[in-house]
């Protein structure tokens, strides 16, 4: 039986349809928003997956080319291989707000698949897919503790807008996705053009209010379908074992969790675990796992109690204190720009490479083919956390962290046309103990300035945490990895002194109100300003010159009709220019020519050659010409490559000329002036206009 629920979102109907499509999935919903249609299906296995301590949830978002009336590229002409960066980022966007809503100890393999079936280029499918994922789980047997919903918030001409169109987003200084439940915001992700903390909180509030009717629609659909929900996994506590572990480990756990350094703390924690396992050994095969879980709960309790009752963090810092910062710029001799940013036990090497327009990244998406001239790639090798792992391509986490840093830095890059380079930044995480993505933002900003990229201002980032126990609220600046794991909210804020450029926030508990969010953002601003001050002590502005090893790029415009003259038959002309100068030359259909070479003189020589081939004659300009043909009524002269004009016999001399050959011969070089170009493009030249008139006149 088909069920349909409709709600207005952002002035347009959002339709939830279930019961007719993908009926063998545990729960499925067809979401319609404008002409954007997304199918979301949620399914779980019947068997428990043994031996895991995490929610076995897979979220896959896929965009089908047919949704936009396109056929995929490549030999196979089908969607195969790795998901695109956008698909990966959207999968993460869906995963983050729904994963915490699975019951504790949930051990059934569960998959959520969101498939874009139609897209209208105005209504982004990502927030539709996120809302649909919650709906599919809500109407399935899965004991999902939702629902949640999401909207995109923009600000156009000072007014907030829900789910602005693609065209409106171009004019918006804010682009954030807000996901929430009925009681609280659970996730915020997006970028901005230097908005204030107050404005950001207003935007989040605005988005949360728009979410409430969408949650009502999900509840109404669930009421109509009336799924039989499975009972959440029963959490059975062995109270005697809990007490035994606490008695044996509590005192030492506090000593362990006040060890400032990461690896000594890890080693002491491991030794404590091994001691407790040995003391409480049993024939019960589940005993080791039970002890591990009890120790994990004890660790969380000890750390949180230290903060609430003693005002003490794991490494002894104040709640708003930033770890020691060390910065080095220009550390690599042959790269175009580099910097090492170290904050506590987190260290990042950022390296900048400059290239030409041919180095831009081609993006094939539903909206069509586009090109990226700025890329930021984040690498997280195993050695950065003292582990051993095969080297593989970037995972979802690395792609997500790179996208956050890219969004943060993009706001300060020179605008199109101001800096004719493709820019790639690579962040190599060399050590990690929390906030490596924020160290990437700081290191990338420094490396760009070291490369001489004219960014408008430095950008810094800070990762914040929150602990809430009853009415006691603690906001933590520059969190460690353990603090991230044990806290109630994790959010990353980036920006300059002017305002925020990006935010990523995940809330793990209810009850985070506007006041708490405002306080956390203000403390984040203070930390960001402190970090920016440290950065400016080392490098306060972009270097005035590019690296001597960076390519020199010159961009010129030519008449598109002249492109064939530059390329020549079979590419003969352009190959000769490249061979002669050593420069790399890219020509676009618009007539834009980009010349690049490590040698500035080579660039200049290539420009001279191209200008010579494409220069247009101008009335009133003087040209050194070559006589190519003589007639009774005048001489034809070549003033530019393949461009000829007529010097009429009357324009050869100030005096009367009886015979053309009395003045010029074929092959002579003579200075001429363009005196007219008629509507048919014929050029009239004058030799006498280029000569000084003799004293006393002359005919």
UniProtKB/Swiss-Prot annotation:
Catalytic activity: RNA(n+1) + phosphate = RNA(n) + a ribonucleoside 5'-diphosphate
Biological process per Gene Ontology, one example term: RNA processing
Subcellular location: Cytoplasm
Entry annotated with the keyword ATP-binding: no
Matches recorded under CDD domains: KH-I_PNPase, RNase_PH_PNPase_1, RNase_PH_PNPase_2, S1_PNPase
PROSITE patterns (alphabetical): KH_TYPE_1 (PS50084), S1 (PS50126)
Top-level enzyme category: transferase
Any one of the GO CC terms: cytosol
Family: Belongs to the polyribonucleotide nucleotidyltransferase family.
The protein's name in its UniProt record: Polyribonucleotide nucleotidyltransferase
Organism: Syntrophobacter fumaroxidans (strain DSM 10017 / MPOB)
Gene: pnp
